[in-house]
Amino acid sequence: MKFSCRAATLALAGVACVASSALAHHAVQAVFDVNKPITVSGSITKVEWINPHSYISLDAKGEKGQVQHWTFELAGPGALRSAGLSREDRGGLKPGDQVKVEGIAAKDGTTTGFLNKLYFPDGRVFVLANKDPYAR
């Protein structure tokens, strides 16, 4: 079987495209502004324990008293389970719980963020990300 230089080049180009897409997908700084830390307190409206990333949505009061709907991205269920939060009870979180979230804001200016630290109603603190966002 003859393997041409053209076929090898095309195969390598394909692998490079897939690899770069995977890296971009998993780079927090591709979507979130690591230089824009945020803290949001509010009432949980939804917990999505799904792959490849889980999400917590909450309603918080804006600067002018208006309700803002926030969504925070977390790691996937496997990583959350390893960190001590289970899918079965959604990490002990349920709609109506008052929580505080520390994270980084989305680059596009929407009310979305990447969760670094979650303060539970019972006083527990869950740390998802290292303080150095490039360490992920």
Residue spans for each PLM region:
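Bacterial N-terminal signal peptides that target proteins for export
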Residues: 1-11
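Bacterial N-terminal signal peptides
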Residues: 9-21
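OB-fold/S1-family single-stranded nucleic acid-binding modules
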Residues: 104-130
